[in-house]
Amino acid sequence: MPLDGVKNIVLVLSGKGGVGKSSVTLQLALTFCLQGRSVGILDVDLTGPSIPRLVGLEDAKITQAPGGWLPVTVHPFHTPSSDGLNGSQRANKPDDSNESSSSTVETAPQSTNFCGSLRCMSLGFLLRDRGDAVIWRGPKKTAMIRQFLTDVLWGETDYLLIDTPPGTSDEHIALAEQLLTIQQTYSLRSSRATAPKLAGAVLVTTPQAISTSDVRKEINFCVKTRIPVLGVIENMSGYTCPCCGEVSNVFSRGGGQIMAQETGVRFLGAVPIDVGFGEMVEGWKKDSTGQDQGNKATKKGQDARLDSYDDLLVERYKKCWSFSVFEEFAKKLIGLIEGSDQQ
């Protein structure tokens, strides 16, 4: 069945392009992983897929399995070597079941000593050349969305984040219709398999009025398609000088929070521009074996495997100052989706 093993689906939407929606998707995915959840990213921005570049796997190719496509692995389930756990502790893999809690957002599930796996699927992996333009009409886009949602073998996945194109286009309509069809298909099955939960949408905006006005249209889209709005993230909310620490409001200030208050949706928080994150995704790339091209380690066996974890994108991301901001977003969202938020 489509999406067997996927527990929760979260859409990431934006009204305008260039607001950092794909980078927000990736950072949410990485912080979900660091909360011990297994995560998948489905990139349905068909004409401008960004996820392969952001994860440093532009040259990766999709593997065809008997039951469908296998998504590209960004990193496996692992325990970072810096955690200092011994072999027996590593062997005791925790249960990934989403336990509900009676705590509020402020006491949402804490970080674990384990990092969940991250896999991704994008049209960018299927193009013959990464510079090829995708010039498709609506029916072909709809067919591709349907295939992404029915033919990808995600396996056990706690969260599937769907990175969408800006606005409300053919991709969004096809996505909403296909997810509804999948829900109906599961309801007709006599087996014990449960349908993936469409947890809701995270909306991304920048502070300017021209961006927040288009996000209002996204909220209206969610209302009409009955997709819950989990919250709004204001991205690029100022620039922090690396020398003096002064914050300059390059793109106005507070527009996302004001819009959230006026529309009655949750404001998750604001994220200033993180130069370190940009340098990380621009200057880091894996080779065809999945290893960091800059990693010259020659160790073999278990030690080499553990050392390689420190070179993973998720481990490098923890050094970016925006990690702490997105960690709070992840805890809030996990609390909302898994039932630990009583608000």
UniProtKB/Swiss-Prot annotation:
GO molecular function list? 4 iron, 4 sulfur cluster binding; ATP binding; ATP-dependent FeS chaperone activity; metal ion binding
Read off the InterPro entries from this record.
Mrp/NBP35_ATP-bd, NUBP2/Cfd1_eukaryotes, P-loop_NTPase, YlxH/NBP35
Q: Where is the composition biased (Polar residues)?
A: 80-91, 99-110
Q: What is its main location?
A: cytoplasm
So which domain of life are we looking at? Eukaryota
How is the cofactor bound, as the UniProt entry phrases it?
Answer: Binds 4 [4Fe-4S] clusters per heterotetramer. Contains two stable clusters in the N-termini of NBP35 and two labile, bridging clusters between subunits of the NBP35-CFD1 heterotetramer.
Q: What is any one of the record's Gene Ontology cellular component terms?
A: cytosol
Q: Where in the cell is it found?
A: Cytoplasm
Obligatory cofactor(s): [4Fe-4S] cluster
Q: Which residues bind ATP?
A: G15, K16, G17, G18, V19, G20, K21, S22
List of residues binding [4Fe-4S] cluster = C241, C244
> Which parts of the sequence are annotated with region: Disordered?
80-110
One Gene Ontology term from the biological process aspect of the record: iron-sulfur cluster assembly
Q: Does the keyword Iron-sulfur apply?
A: yes
Alphabetical list of Pfam families matching this protein:
ParA
Its job = Component of the cytosolic iron-sulfur (Fe/S) protein assembly (CIA) machinery. Required for maturation of extramitochondrial Fe-S proteins. The NBP35-CFD1 heterotetramer forms a Fe-S scaffold complex, mediating the de novo assembly of an Fe-S cluster and its transfer to target apoproteins.
Family in the record: Belongs to the Mrp/NBP35 ATP-binding proteins family. NUBP2/CFD1 subfamily.
What is this protein's name?
Cytosolic Fe-S cluster assembly factor CFD1
What is the originating organism of this protein?
Coccidioides immitis (strain RS)
